[in-house]
């Protein structure tokens, strides 16, 4: 895969294995945004082409996941009200997660998400996985067979010619509590 620019991020559709609570600063900080209707439609199309299930209620882009470090002042944890975070779908790839499972993810470019991640870091969050790769997982615990790789390669050709674009909306900032 090509070197990623600082403004390129990965997006994950996996079900978070977290319990999300209102933000108090007691147990780390988690922030995420969700795709708008146009984005959900594009992601559903990608999942169909890959032959994997689509779970719109679990679809999100992680802005920051800080298991240990909370924001220095919980009062600063206000989401950017009404802000839409534009993004561009750029590619599909797979990687091994920290749990050893293989994930298929859709790559996006979103300077606004990168800037919000940096803002929350300046306020005290420490992203638990480096480098920062906010992501929407299209499928988890997948065996990447030659057939699956061929589907990924075909989608990457399509995205190279016509990348999708949409916006993330509805930012949430909450405590992280191991579930």
Language model segments and positions:
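Histidine-dependent nucleotide/RNA phosphoesterase domain, centered on the 2H-phosphoesterase fold
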Residues: 2-179
């Amino acid at each position: 895969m090509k070197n990623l620019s600082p403004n390129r991020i990965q997006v994950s559709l996996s079900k978070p294995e977290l319990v999300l609570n209102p933000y108090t600063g007691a147990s780390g900080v988690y922030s995420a945004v969700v795709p708008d209707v146009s984005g959900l439609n594009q992601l559903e199309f990608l999942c169909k082409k890959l032959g994997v299930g689509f779970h719109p209620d679990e679809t999100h882009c992680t802005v920051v996941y800080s298991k240990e470090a909370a924001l220095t002042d919980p009062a600063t944890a206000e989401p950017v009200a009404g802000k839409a975070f534009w993004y561009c779908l750029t590619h599909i790839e797979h990687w091994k997660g920290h749990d050893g499972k293989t994930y298929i993810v859709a790559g996006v470019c979103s300077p606004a998400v990168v800037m919000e991640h940096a803002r929350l870091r300046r306020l005290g969050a420490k992203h638990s996985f480096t480098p920062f790769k906010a992501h929407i997982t299209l499928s988890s615990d997948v065996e990447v067979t030659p057939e699956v790789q061929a589907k990924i390669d075909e989608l990457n050709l399509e995205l190279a010619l016509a990348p999708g674009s949409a916006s993330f909306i509805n930012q949430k900032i909450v405590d992280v509590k191991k579930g």
